[in-house]
């Protein structure tokens, strides 16, 4: 019985650990991201901005772009891969789907490493 209680207590802790590094689900404005582009900004901002994005692409991309905010200003869903920025070291890698014409922010500094067009397989993109 004691083991079951410990196991049940560990589930919320594990969930919170994953959620701390996940992108926020709230909507974000396009800022200065041109229509038809996927953009990532290196620093946090709110409302409009003239800050230059660290990544602006209209095609599939791989590399490393520092990011706090991202916006998909295209007509297609995107699969985005990112890693937790841990100083000079690379942290855990995550992948998420970004809806067309939507954006959000990371709750901690990240590096976006891959952007690909998502194949429409009928499953929703959150």
Locate predicted features.
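N-terminal prepro-regions of secreted/extracellular proteins
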Residues: 1-39
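Post-signal peptide N-terminal regions of Sec-secreted extracellular proteins
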Residues: 27-126
């Amino acid at each position: 019985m004691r083991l079951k209680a410990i196991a049940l207590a560990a589930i919320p802790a594990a969930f919170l650990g994953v959620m701390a590094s996940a992108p926020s689900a709230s909507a974000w404005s396009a800022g200065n991201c041109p229509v038809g582009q996927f953009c990532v900004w290196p620093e946090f901002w709110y409302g409009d901005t003239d800050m230059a994005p660290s990544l602006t692409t209209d095609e599939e991309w791989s590399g490393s772009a520092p990011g706090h905010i991202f916006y998909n200003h295209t007509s297609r869903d995107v699969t985005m891969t990112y890693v937790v920025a841990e100083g000079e070291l690379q942290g855990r890698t995550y992948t998420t789907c970004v809806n067309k014409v939507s954006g959000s922010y990371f709750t901690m500094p990240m590096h976006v490493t891959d952007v690909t067009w998502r194949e429409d397989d009928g499953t929703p993109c959150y």
